[in-house]
């Protein structure tokens, strides 16, 4: 039986040992849902879309996300397993696993900052606010709460004879449902946002005010880059025109289902036993991990 069909059969009907032995605690509920995340960007260089779509199995704070097709950006990983103890990327074709940090996983979607040395980045003028904004749209049979997010920050890159300022402005809407059984580290919206250093810390602290399980999010990001050349007399040549890029980040949950837990469910959110652990650089594509 194919692995995906086997997982579906276990979810629908449970294992052969669905009842816990006398005196044992009740197994945690098992949750499945479809998760789609995408970032659509329009820049002076053109348009680009990065997306990930697949099925998530969540249990007791742990989760496994299996992509429906393809791999996560900048990697050969087709699945990710995550929980309170950490995060692991899985390459199904190679039967390989690699431990990673949440920042490593975020870098797959956002990319890493430029190599230090040629320019020294500094983050300035950071602000972030998350506010509750009443009730959101119902999600299946559950009510939701709506949150509004506003944030801004500026990254200053200094190099000999040139200063570049990159200002980022972010607005967004998040709808969440009180579904504790579905919650896991995969819910962290911070990994979808291009915030670095102090901006990431401030934004993360503000996003912690979001409650519940985020079933929908839409975030609009505008980035404006301008450059100046200190020491060059004004009027010598016109300054470069500012460059603007716009991105829309979405997260959407569909077809969520919950069933009673059964013995053996923990294997559905665990690293397969026949996978071999490798270094992270063996799964990343296009660059080596430090």
Feature roles, as predicted:
Residues 4-27:
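Bacterial Sec-dependent signal peptides at the C-terminal "C-region" and cleavage site
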Residues 23-290:
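Extended soluble regions of mature proteins
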Residues 1-5, 141:
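Positively charged n-region of N-terminal signal peptides that target proteins for export
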């Amino acid at each position: 039986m194919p692995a995906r069909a086997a997982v579906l059969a276990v979810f629908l009907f449970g294992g052969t040992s669905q009842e816990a032995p006398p005196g044992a605690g009740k197994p945690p509920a098992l949750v499945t849902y479809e998760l789609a995340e995408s970032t659509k960007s329009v820049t002076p260089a053109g348009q680009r879309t990065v997306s990930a779509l697949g099925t998530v199995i969540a249990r007791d704070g742990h989760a496994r996300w299996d992509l429906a097709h393809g791999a996560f950006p900048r990697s050969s990983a087709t699945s990710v397993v995550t929980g309170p103890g950490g995060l692991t990327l899985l390459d199904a074709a190679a039967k390989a696993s690699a431990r990673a940090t949440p920042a490593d996983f975020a870098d797959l979607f956002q990319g890493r900052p430029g190599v230090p040395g040629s320019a020294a980045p500094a983050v300035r003028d950071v602000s972030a606010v998350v506010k509750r904004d009443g009730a959101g749209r119902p999600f299946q049979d559950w009510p939701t709460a709506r949150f509004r997010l506003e944030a801004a920050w500026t990254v200053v890159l200094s190099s000999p004879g040139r200063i570049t300022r990159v200002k980022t402005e972010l607005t967004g809407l998040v709808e969440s449902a009180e579904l504790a059984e579905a919650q896991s580290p995969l819910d962290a919206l911070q990994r979808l946002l291009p915030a670095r250093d102090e901006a990431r810390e401030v934004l993360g602290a503000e996003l912690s005010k979001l409650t519940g399980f985020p079933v929908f999010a839409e975030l609009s990001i505008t980035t404006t880059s301008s450059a100046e050349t200190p020491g060059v007399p004004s009027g010598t040549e016109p300054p470069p025109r500012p460059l603007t890029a716009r991105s829309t980040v979405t997260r959407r949950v569909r077809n969520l289902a919950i069933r009673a837990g059964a013995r053996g469910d923990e294997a559905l959110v665990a690293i397969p036993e026949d996978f071999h652990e490798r270094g992270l650089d063996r799964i990343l594509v296009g660059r080596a991990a430090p």
